[in-house]
Amino acid sequence: MENPQIEMGAFKANGPQLQNGGLRSSMVQSWNLQRFVESALRSIRIVIFTSKLNLLLPFGPASIILHYTTSRHGLVFLFSMLGITPLAERLGYATEQLAIYTGPTVGGLLNATFGNATEMIIAIYALKNGMIRVVQQSLLGSILSNMLLVMGCAFFAGGIVHRNKDQVFSKATAVVNSGLLLMAVMGLMFPAVLHFTHSEVRQGASEVSLSRFSSCIMLVAYASYLYFQLSGRNNAYSPIGSEEMPNEDAAEEDEESEIGMWESIAWLAMLTLWVSILSEYLVNAIEGASDSLNLPVAFISVILLPIVGNAAEHASAIMFAMKDKLDITLGVAIGSSTQISMFVIPFCVVIGWMMGQKMDLNFQLFETATLFITVLVVAFMLQDGVANYLKGLMLILCYLIVAASFFVHVDPQSSDD
């Protein structure tokens, strides 16, 4: 039998060590908790308080309150639109921060997915409610807004600031994007022509089948384009001046992050959830807003709704043009248009297919013709690789003509209903 006094002595000898170990463990846990809290507070400060657009955030909760307390659909629509605008910008910011940690390939896929997340979320809620024309027109409006208004304002502002010289950009990149946009026009044109020439094999079904097949082809084409861009090719399709940029500046611009990877993921999840909530109220208020504001649904969908997703892109495109970084401006404006036409629209067709909704690529003749003419105008503007304020002014004036056209346009499907 062991001596109890020996056991007690051993316990007394090891007691201070056990106490020190427990104290050290609690200190480590406390320090980790403190670091977590400090990191969380820092990310909140950066994400919430560094963007002036966030002054519009209170309009989001206000729109929800108005939805349940009044029947003023016009105010609910406007407040929802204002509330989503800063969320769209912060969603893009969180995506860019996460892309820093993931590398160019995954970062490119993230940008393809979340770059136009606001438009996709609004489109999915509209699809859920069977508002196929709102989906088609809002996505068309985003393309037109980016190509004409965003790029026009950027060219105009950059041309005024740098009026003594021509601003140049990569012609090769512009040609590739123009080609993809023309392919998107082709994908939208054939279902419309098939419908209006009454040459379908199965009336009302052939255009849907063709749209679904074309959407899959367009998604493959966009995936190939992404791979082509992200495969590390050092050729004419890289942005101009990239080879001349000092390594220090490149590292400084490309690799520095303001928030951590897990913080970026958390913000992406929270912002996407909040955009989803507000999008539901926005979509539900569209028809009521059309009546109360005395505006056509087509005008709201094509002109007003794209403001939600394009406000941040508009500001950043102008800023980069004023800094004489035209390739980044084109990446924002034309790149976003390419992404919507070759990824978001086909993706919505596939999602509608899964939902049992007959979402197709028949955007009607008026909308398809508008897109076709716009792509041609922009392609001619970009063919020489030079930007100036006159080109910007012409693009802005073209957008005003488009806006006026949709203000007096009566949607044939709406009138039939």
From Swiss-Prot:
Side of membrane Cytoplasmic, spans: 1-45, 95-105, 162-173, 231-258, 313-330, 382-389
Subcellular location: Vacuole membrane
Gene Ontology terms: biological process: calcium ion transmembrane transport; intracellular calcium ion homeostasis
Tissue expr: Ubiquitous.
Transmembrane segments annotated in the record for this chain: 46-66, 74-94, 106-126, 141-161, 174-194, 208-230, 259-279, 292-312, 331-351, 361-381, 390-410
Main subcellular location of this protein, as a coarse class: membrane
GO cellular component terms attached to this protein's record: plant-type vacuole membrane
Membrane topology, from the record: Multi-pass membrane protein
GO MF entries: calcium:proton antiporter activity
Residue segments, region Cation selection: 115-150, 309-344
Gene3D superfamilies linked: NCX, central ion-binding region
Swiss-Prot/TrEMBL keywords: Antiport, Calcium, Calcium transport, Ion transport, Membrane, Transmembrane, Transmembrane helix, Transport, Vacuole
Extracellular side: 67-73, 127-140, 195-207, 280-291, 352-360, 411-417
Superkingdom per UniProt: Eukaryota
Function recorded in the entry: Vacuolar cation/proton exchanger (CAX). Translocates Ca(2+) and other metal ions into vacuoles using the proton gradient formed by H(+)-ATPase and H(+)-pyrophosphatase.
Family in the record: Belongs to the Ca(2+):cation antiporter (CaCA) (TC 2.A.19) family. Cation/proton exchanger (CAX) subfamily.
Protein name, as recorded: Vacuolar cation/proton exchanger 3
Organism of this sequence: Oryza sativa subsp. japonica
Gene: CAX3
